[in-house]
Amino acid sequence: MPHAFKPGDLVFAKMKGYPHWPARIDDIADGAVKPPPNKYPIFFFGTHETAFLGPKDLFPYDKCKDKYGKPNKRKGFNEGLWEIQNNPHASYSAPLPVSSSDSEAPEADLGGGSDADKEKEARRVMTVTAVTTTATSGRTESDSDSDKNSDHSGLKRKTPVLKMSVSKRARKASSDLDQASVSPSEEDSESPSESEKTSDQDFTPEKKTIARAPRRAPLGGRKKKKVPSASDSDSRADSDGAKEEPVVTAQPSPSSSSSSSSSSASDSDVSIKKPPRGRKPAEKPPPKPRGRRSKPERPPSTSSSDSDSDSGEVDRISEWKRRDEERRRELEARRRREQEEELRRLREQEREEKERRKERAERGGSSGEELEDEEPVKKRSRKARGRGTPSSSDSEPEGELGKEGKKLAKKSQLQGSESARKPGQKEKRGRPDEKPRARPVKVERTRKRSEGLSLDRKGEKKKEPSVEERLQKLHSEIKFALKVDNPDVRRCLSALEELGTLQVTSQILQKNTDVVATLKKIRRYKANKDVMAKAAEVYTRLKSRVLGPKVEALQKVNKAGAEKERADGEKVEEQPGEQAPRELAEDEPSTDRSAPVNGEAASQKGENTEDGAQEDGQDLEDGPRGGSSEELHDSPQDSSDPARPGNEHQDHERMQLASESADDDDEDS
């Protein structure tokens, strides 16, 4: 069951991102923001921040002292443990009722009041500022990461009453406000009192903490209207050193003090708002606040020492930042110097390369020894670069320029020595210099020849592989050689011979039927008998390759009796012309019945059309199509078993083919 708490109870409060913090259940001041239901206003010791938390996040101090009361690294936590034990009523927000004497005290001070009052108020301000510096330095450094989670955790400030006083006091005459703003500035600048010195010392570290913890600004709470009141209270405490009450009420968190002290020019605005805050509590006479005011005076020495130590830490941090900035500047300067040096070196190298190219162009053929001389120069330049890079980062640019000048001098000396060697070498060589110039020409010629041969070989290799291409090429050559206007017999004979040597398959002939047709036509080329004979020979070769070797043997055997059986063969030619398939003969009548071939009369061509059509039909069946289906399939069977009774018709067809070939040979002869 959650514990019921009362105002003034000491507890450990748990907020997101923070350990169980020593805190106190606070009173709700008149006019202050009321907490939501089931939540208590909490005052955190050490940091002096306020928040609204539920009972589940609150743990009694006495019961949980051993569990949560252990020292922690978080700055402000150990101070909170000390405060909850030694000063449980500590508070920056002074109670609202203040006596008239207290409210009139700041006005008396502005007009030059008693010295005793000034000293008392100065001591109070010292204690307040000391605690603020400790809180700011601790909370900003340790909780910079956890602040993002706790930005919206519900921290509030107890300064709404002071805001109302500002609105009431805003009607005061401008002359009084100007006097109030001028008097504290003059006191801070001219009076050498110890209280003012301490206030200045406390004010400077607050300014320095701004650079460290600008992120703490949103931690102050959800209401941004109260931030200027906190800044006014801090600057007022540092400038006047005489108004402790308004400073206490308006000091809600270290974040507000750090953000408010960022601008030193806000002193004038602070002085304008001082009198309204001093007079607002004058309406409420109860003298209770004095008892609480005396309590913060107990540990003034410790708070002042803490403020001094914090200011020293801030000074150290600022020194470290300055050193870091100086180092960064030095590094940037070194980088710039190195970049400039690299650019200079690159430019020098480019110039040297250009000079070397010019020298090489002038020298011409004799470049062997020059390359040998250039290699040590490159090595030296590389060594010089290796030496120059580490020294450039440490040495000044003037020393670097001096080193670069030395390098250039060395390079110029080396170039001078090379130029001095050249005339001696030329004198020694004399005429032999001309010979190496002539040699490259011969080498180039040999290279060109070898390249030409290699190209020819490549061309031959490309032509060799494809048989179809050669067949088509020879076909075109034969057609071109047997033109009517200018026939070239030798070229035609050579092409026919090459065509006979080609290893042609039946598939290739089926694709290229035009070749077979032209060979048939050339067999009747009467302008030259050699062409006719060669064409007939090539035609028979192709036919034998397609039909098989046994057909050739039968033809040779039957050649002897071909002359005797001419008459019978002519009669029999009509029968196979009717029986044999005439598909190819019908497909190619146009080729045989086309215009007369070279030197052949139309009448002669017409006489031979009937016989030629039959012969061509059978030949085409045998040649490109591999013969008729019956002949091709039955020929191996006939050779294996010629005595079979069913093969008489096939034997008769073979005899006819043999007789036809014999007749063709006789006609050609």
UniProtKB/Swiss-Prot annotation:
It is found in: Nucleus; Cytoplasm. Expressed in the spinal cord (at protein level). Primarily restricted to neurons, astrocytes and oligodendrocytes and is particularly expressed in motor neurons of the anterior horn (at protein level). Significantly up-regulated in the injured spinal cord (at protein level). Keywords: Coiled coil, Cytoplasm, DNA damage, DNA recombination, DNA repair, Isopeptide bond, Myogenesis, Nucleus, Phosphoprotein, Ubl conjugation. Gene3D superfamilies: 2.30.30.140, Conserved domain common to transcription factors TFIIS, elongin A, CRSP70 (1.20.930.10). Residues 115-124, 140-154, 194-209, 233-246, 313-363, 419-469, 561-584, 622-636, 646-655 have a biased composition (Basic and acidic residues). The modification Phosphoserine is found at residues 114, 137, 165, 229, 231, 233, 239, 268, 307, 366-367, 391-393, 395, 450, 454, 628-629, 635, 640, 659, 661, 669. Residues 155-172 have a biased composition (Basic residues). One of its GO terms (cellular component) is nucleus. One of its GO terms (biological process) is skeletal muscle tissue regeneration. Pfam families: LEDGF, PWWP. The modification Phosphothreonine is found at T609. SUPFAM superfamilies: HIV integrase-binding domain, Tudor/PWWP/MBT. Residues 609-621 have a biased composition (Acidic residues). GO terms for molecular function: histone H3K27me3 reader activity; histone H3K9me2/3 reader activity; histone reader activity; methylated histone binding. There is a cross-link at K550 (Glycyl lysine isopeptide (Lys-Gly) (interchain with G-Cter in SUMO2)). Residues 466-548 are annotated as: Interaction with DPF3/BAF45C isoform 2. It comes from the Eukaryota. Residues 7-64 form the PWWP domain. Residues 92-469, 558-669 are annotated as: Disordered. Signal peptide: none annotated. Residues 125-139, 252-269 have a biased composition (Low complexity). The keyword Cytoplasm applies. Belongs to the HDGF family. Interacts with HDGF. Interacts with trimethylated 'Lys-36' of histone H3 (H3K36me3). Interacts with trimethylated 'Lys-79' of histone H3 (H3K79me3), but has higher affinity for H3K36me3. Interacts with IWS1. Interacts with H2AX, POGZ, RBBP8 and CBX1. Interacts with histones H3K9me3, H3K27me3 and H3K36me2. Interacts with DPF3a (isoform 2 of DPF3/BAF45C). Interacts with SMARCA4/BRG1/BAF190A, SMARCC1/BAF155 and SMARCD1/BAF60A in a DPF3a-dependent manner. Acts as an epigenetic regulator of myogenesis in cooperation with DPF3a (isoform 2 of DPF3/BAF45C). Associates with the BAF complex via its interaction with DPF3a and HDGFL2-DPF3a activate myogenic genes by increasing chromatin accessibility through recruitment of SMARCA4/BRG1/BAF190A (ATPase subunit of the BAF complex) to myogenic gene promoters. Promotes the repair of DNA double-strand breaks (DSBs) through the homologous recombination pathway by facilitating the recruitment of the DNA endonuclease RBBP8 to the DSBs. This is Hepatoma-derived growth factor-related protein 2. The lineage of its organism: Eukaryota, Metazoa, Chordata, Craniata, Vertebrata. The gene is Hdgfl2.
